[in-house]
Amino acid sequence: MKIGIVTGIPGVGKTTVLSFADKILTEKGIPHKIANYGDYMLNTALKEGYVNSRDEIRKLQIEKQRELQALAARRIVEDLSLLGDEGIGLIDTHAVIRTPAGYLPGLPRHVIEVLSPKVIFLLEADPRIILERQKRDNSRARADYSDTTVINEVIQFARYSAMASAVLVGASVKVVINQEGDPSIAASDIINSLM
């Protein structure tokens, strides 16, 4: 099984690109699964009785959060292993999380060593395009990313973080541009890099 971690700043179009990847892999008859890391963390936290809602996760003690991250990573790998040798697992997450206290790595050692991806993908687009996409998406609150300078900074920190994580497991890091108007190009690029 080949695992790719797909990261991207809010508004870059990660969900859309991954839905195109799902469609392409289905059409090709390739066993695959797209695992949303945040959903696995929530489901694990609920199952373990740590929280009653998603908002409670960030209020947990740091050690409890680290334990939760590792448990979620193990569950993802367990699920992806069911795909067999020819399967492709794509993990939807963030390389960094921007917080008021600074940037948190999205793929710290205790997570990346469990996931052990072949490739860490950085889905990117021009910051002005990301800003326009954010303005069109009323379903999400992204005021903390509503400036091209901030978007550029987050993209740079994501690159640093992805490379630091990749070093720990011998993965490659690939920047994939999500072209405005045709997310299938980025989806195909991700799939082809894992074949």
UniProtKB/Swiss-Prot annotation:
Top-rank EC class of the record's enzyme: transferase
Protein's cellular compartments: Cytoplasm
EC numbers for this chain: 2.7.4.3
Disulfides per UniProt: none
GO (cellular component) term, any one: cytoplasm
Keyword Nucleotide-binding: yes
Keywords associated with the record: ATP-binding, Cytoplasm, Kinase, Nucleotide-binding, Transferase
Catalytically driven reaction(s): AMP + ATP = 2 ADP
Entry annotated with the keyword Transferase: yes
One function term, GO molecular function aspect: adenylate kinase activity
Binding-site residues, ATP: 8-16
Family classification: Belongs to the archaeal adenylate kinase family.
Record-given protein name: Adenylate kinase
Organism field: Saccharolobus islandicus (strain L.S.2.15 / Lassen #1) (Sulfolobus islandicus)
